[in-house]
Amino acid sequence: MYRKTYKIFENLLLIVINFFPQITKYRYIRVNGPSMEPTLKNNSILFMKRFNLSTDKLKRFSIIRYKDSVNKFYIKRIIGLPLEKIEIIDSKLFIDSEYQETDILEKNKNYSWMLKKNQIILFGDNYLNSGFDSRKLGPINLSDIQITHIR
């Protein structure tokens, strides 16, 4: 009797764990690829919250998931926020002309973006192997953000 009750409880718990993300604003996401290393390893699991454009505020250096124009998903870090001027000059990051101490940038590359009110700049943490981030794609629209990382 005890064993049967335990098995039923175990199965119910598995159902709840599997369906919890489907009925709430939270999701488990698997990291695919090395673009966020060393912060997030390939195949790591993240607990993330669905992003609501009208109520959620973005924070610089937060980790988010976004989708590109062919509905492929990427996990990246927010570097630039709406209405900011983001520049990378001689491997140094400037936000609205103020130098930001960081070691995130590759050598011998310069970039400059003036963001609109619905745009952000995203980089992967593995700057030499980051794939599809704003250095390749330019600014990302806020409407493309799917979920934000919960720490």
Regions flagged by a language model, labelled:
Residues 1-74, 81-86, 135-151:
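Protein maturation boundaries and topogenic segments
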Residues 49, 67-68, 73-76, 87-151:
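Acidic/glycine-rich C-terminal interaction modules and beta/coil loop segments
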